[in-house]
Amino acid sequence: MNHTIISLALIFFQLTTTALVVGFTSREHLFLRAIGSVPQGFSAYHQIVFLCSHISNPVNRAFLGAASVFLVILYVDAAILSRWTFASQSPTSSLGGLIPPTTRDTPKTQNNATTAETSASFLRKLSFGFLIALQSRFPATPWAVPRLPPFHKADPKHTPTKSAFLLKNTTKCLVYLLLLRATSGLGNPDDNPVVFASDRIPLFSRLGDKGPGGITLSEIGTRVGAVMGYWAIQYAVIDLLYSLLAVVAVSLHLTDVKGWVPVFGSVSDARGVRLFWGQFYHQLVRQGCSSIAHYITYFILRFRKDSGSLAARYVFMTLVFAVSGVFHTLSDVSQGIPLGESGAMRFFVLQAIGIMLEDGFQAIVSRRRQSGHHGRGKLERVLGSVSGPVWLVTWLTWTSPGWIYMSLQRDRGVPIIPF
């Protein structure tokens, strides 16, 4: 049997496990829901082992490994923390942060839920289970991930017609395919182990070094180009896959257009580290990571959510990035990067630190402006609009190589688009 088919079968098994648990168990069946995490984790573990030993294409390994690991995180959120059920058609627990603990699950709701659960058909329950298993942003619902980009920035309530939606996304797929195919042969992959060597990851500590280990202007240019190129390719690949799935799902009447809001925000939103991660970059893993971080912050560490304390917000944010770091670390392992060499955890935790630094600087500037009692001049406004993107590029240029150089070292020029 084709190895890729076996890998996809493992992913389908994980999706089916989530669908069965969410669709056919009530919120009180917590033991059964917890037991469901065992086959999820078992599948992800064997997926990683299988990919490392049987799948040679690094692109396939990256996609399949990331999908399998993320389905474990999604299961923990949907089945255990948020406890989605068919009977309520919604999450029934606030442990994952989706709903206030006193706004749902009243006795009346539970009685109605029991009746609905008893009379529902097998296919309806299974369909609902798969709907949740395949969701990660919940657009057009009360539980949508914060700050999802609208279809039209000037008119956030606008939803395109089906024909316009299909035309736009089909065009995007074709453009991305052509761009990725055209850029796949650029550069010499034989140079990658040297150009992206681990000793070239440090930046500021090498600025004053005049010896062979020092950094040159040429290397800085290569570093900036590699980092920007990496994130541009990530953007293109993710948007391509998302648009392709959207075209298939809407064409076959599996879902409505309103469920496929853009996966990325506007590039103009990327004016700093916080806006890059919170508003521009895709939010596909946000709910799963936030759910686990919410539980740890407010139910294990016992921070008060209603206090609005800076410490609670920053602990929560750091944990969100840390969970994302775990996810990306295991995804790296599926690509053949040894666990100890993956820089994913360090990179993602650094993003939280970058946001804290950004917040602190903005607070100082705001306080100075208030104390001076003067508005922003034209020059200050121009500098303000430029400083955000410059700061973001500088931050990513410093922090990204610690993570992405590990995979770039191993890049042997295998095209992302194999045809």
From Swiss-Prot:
GO cellular component, one term: membrane
Reactions accelerated catalytically: 3-O-(beta-D-glucopyranosyl)-2alpha-hydroxyisomotiol + acetyl-CoA = 3-O-(beta-D-glucopyranosyl)-2alpha-acetoxyisomotiol + CoA; 2-deacetylfuscoatroside + acetyl-CoA = fuscoatroside + CoA
E.C. numbers: 2.3.1.-
Residues the record marks as carrying a glycan: 2, 112, 169
Gene Ontology molecular function, alphabetical: O-acyltransferase activity
Pathway(s) it belongs to: Secondary metabolite biosynthesis; terpenoid biosynthesis
Residue span of region Disordered: 89-114
Topology versus the membrane: Multi-pass membrane protein
Industrial and biotechnological uses noted in the record: Fuscoatroside and some of its derivatives show interesting antifungal activity against Candida albicans and Aspergillus niger.
Main localisation: membrane
Keywords: Acyltransferase, Glycoprotein, Membrane, Transferase, Transmembrane, Transmembrane helix
Cellular localisation: Membrane
Superkingdom, taxonomy of origin: Eukaryota
GO terms for biological process, alphabetical: lipid metabolic process
Membrane spanning stretches: 4-24, 62-82, 230-250, 314-334, 337-357, 386-406
Main enzyme class: transferase
Family per similarity comment: Belongs to the wax synthase family.
Known function: Terpene cyclase-glycosyl transferase fusion protein; part of the gene cluster that mediates the biosynthesis of the enfumafungin-type antibiotic, fuscoatroside. Within the pathway, fsoF catalyzes the acetylation of C2-alpha-OH following the C2 hydroxylation by the cytochrome monooxygenase fsoD. The fuscoatroside biosynthesis is initiated by the cyclization of 2,3(S)-oxidosqualene through FsoA's terpene cyclase (TC) domain, leading to the formation of the fernane skeleton isomotiol, harboring a fernane triterpene skeleton with a C8-C9 double bond.
Protein name: Acetyltransferase fsoF
UniProt organism field: Humicola fuscoatra
